[in-house]
Design a protein with these regions (language model features):
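Extracytoplasmic
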Residues: 53, 70-72, 96, 108, ...
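C-terminal partner/receptor-binding element of secreted or periplasmic proteins
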Residues: 117-151
Length: 151
C-alpha cells in the first residue's frame, strides 16, 4: 500500500510540475503587497533605463464596474534593442511584446509576480538564432522580479 501511495504521489507530482511548466509562465512569491511590489518593479524598470509603457490595475477596473477581483496589476515595459532583435528572429513574437509582468494576489493572500518565460516564447514562435538575446532577457527578468519581490 505504501508503494502504491508513493508511486501515485510521484506520478501526480510529475504531472503537476509538467502542467506548471507548460503554461509558459515563471512565477515567484513577493515579500510585499501587490501594489508595493509593482511600485518597486516600476522603479527598477525606470532605473535600468528600460521603456515603461503602462501599468494596468485590473482590480481597480473591476471595481469600476462593480465587480470584485483580488489585487491584479500588469506592467508593460521593454527594451527596443532586445525586442527588435527578437522580432528579427521571429516577427510573430511581436504579439508577446512589450514584456509584461503580472503582480497578483493568490487565494491564500500571497503576492506573486509572473512573467512569460523567454524560452517558452522561443518555442512558441519557432525562434532561431536568438539564444544570446533570450539569455540576456531571461537574466534581466529574473533579476528585476527578484529585486522587486525581496525584503
Amino acid at each position: 500500500m505504501k508503494l502504491i501511495i508513493a508511486s501515485l504521489t510521484l506520478i501526480l507530482g510529475t504531472f503537476s510540475m509538467t502542467a506548471i511548466a507548460q503554461n509558459g509562465l515563471i512565477t515567484i512569491e513577493s515579500q510585499h503587497s501587490v501594489n508595493t511590489t509593482a511600485d518597486r518593479f516600476e522603479q527598477l524598470v525606470n532605473d535600468k533605463d528600460l521603456t515603461f509603457f503602462t501599468r494596468i490595475d485590473h482590480a481597480k477596473n473591476a471595481a469600476g464596474v462593480e465587480l470584485s477581483l483580488r489585487p491584479t496589476q500588469v506592467i508593460l515595459f521593454g527594451n527596443p534593442v532586445a525586442g527588435t532583435a527578437l522580432m528579427n528572429c521571429a516577427q510573430t513574437v511581436a504579439i508577446d511584446l512589450p514584456q509584461k509582468a503580472l503582480f497578483w494576489e493568490d487565494e491564500d493572500g500571497k503576492s506573486k509576480i509572473s512573467y512569460n518565460d523567454p524560452y517558452h516564447l522561443k518555442e512558441q514562435h519557432s525562434m532561431q538564432g536568438c539564444d544570446a538575446v533570450l539569455e540576456k532577457v531571461s537574466g534581466l527578468l529574473s533579476k528585476l522580479t527578484a529585486a522587486a519581490a525581496a525584503k
